[in-house]
Amino acid sequence: MAGAEDGPGQQPELEDDEAASCRRWGAQHAGARELAALYSPGKRFQEWCCVVLCFSLIAHNMAHLLLLARWEHTPLVMLGMVAGALLADFLSGLVHWGADTWGSVELPIVGKAFIRPFREHHIDPTAITRHDFIETNGDNCLLTLLPLLNMAYKFRTQSPEVLEQLYPWECFVFCLIIFGTFTNQIHKWSHTYFGLPCWVVFLQDWHVILPRKHHRIHHVSPHETYFCITTGWLNYPLERMGFWRRLEDIIQALTGEKPRADDMKWAQKIK
């Protein structure tokens, strides 16, 4: 597998006997091993179903969009592509922030299925580079199924005249879906430092997708900033605004829950 960085930028001191028995970060960390073991056959089956259905719908909808394309749509389509990428980046940050900061692996259904990978990722950041295409993209494919199905339904039921009027909007939605579907693949590439295709490196270097150096900022413990992982365009402005910190302060004031408490619990496991 292609190489990746070994772990977060800051690591706490360990006692000699503790350091000898386990690594603070990485695949040998006790919490990382326990979390990885929670990946079940049922979860794998769900991911396979979502990936197959998602990419079938993407192919179906793309074919219809290409058939409906007109030169006069170009300006609005280009605007929609940029807007779709921006919204996908924000939504990736919102989901990433929510899963990193709140909830627990012990929660019914969503804990092991969706929060678990976020906990594993912080104590073993390179685990994602060892995941295959299905495990990497299965959950994102699940999230984009509903808008893909809605788009496919429109193509099957609406008249050509109505579809032509809706075309710029549908291109925006499709771009949002594509960026959303591939967010975790882009995230995986941001942790991969050797063997990436030249076109991926080009897109990273020109900041079309999340660059590798840019994403390192998030992986400095306690993982409280730079949550947007699709393009990363919104990380700096949101950080300057204190957006995530303000949201955390509001939620903590209302609920009494401490941000990233479960994340730190898993990070501190030593056996």
Swiss-Prot record:
It is found in: Endoplasmic reticulum membrane. It holds the Pfam family Lipid_desat. It catalyses: a 1-(1,2-saturated alkyl)-2-acyl-sn-glycero-3-phosphoethanolamine + 2 Fe(II)-[cytochrome b5] + O2 + 2 H(+) = a 1-O-(1Z-alkenyl)-2-acyl-sn-glycero-3-phosphoethanolamine + 2 Fe(III)-[cytochrome b5] + 2 H2O; a 1-O-hexadecyl-2-acyl-sn-glycero-3-phosphoethanolamine + 2 Fe(II)-[cytochrome b5] + O2 + 2 H(+) = a 1-O-(1Z-hexadecenyl)-2-acyl-sn-glycero-3-phosphoethanolamine + 2 Fe(III)-[cytochrome b5] + 2 H2O; a 1-O-octadecyl-2-acyl-sn-glycero-3-phosphoethanolamine + 2 Fe(II)-[cytochrome b5] + O2 + 2 H(+) = a 1-O-(1Z-octadecenyl)-2-acyl-sn-glycero-3-phosphoethanolamine + 2 Fe(III)-[cytochrome b5] + 2 H2O; a 1-O-(9Z-octadecenyl)-2-acyl-sn-glycero-3-phosphoethanolamine + 2 Fe(II)-[cytochrome b5] + O2 + 2 H(+) = a 1-O-(1Z,9Z-octadecadienyl)-2-acyl-sn-glycero-3-phosphoethanolamine + 2 Fe(III)-[cytochrome b5] + 2 H2O. The lineage of its organism: Eukaryota, Metazoa, Chordata, Craniata, Vertebrata. The keyword Magnesium does not apply. A motif (Histidine box-2) lies at residues 214-218. This is Plasmanylethanolamine desaturase 1. Plasmanylethanolamine desaturase involved in plasmalogen biogenesis in the endoplasmic reticulum membrane. Plasmalogens are glycerophospholipids with a hydrocarbon chain linked by a vinyl ether bond at the glycerol sn-1 position, and are involved in antioxidative and signaling mechanisms. A motif (Histidine box-1) lies at residues 187-191. The chain crosses the membrane at residues 48-68, 75-95, 162-182. One of its GO terms (cellular component) is endoplasmic reticulum membrane. Pathway: Lipid metabolism; fatty acid metabolism. GO terms for molecular function: plasmanylethanolamine desaturase activity. The keyword Oxidoreductase applies. It is an enzyme of class 1 (oxidoreductase).
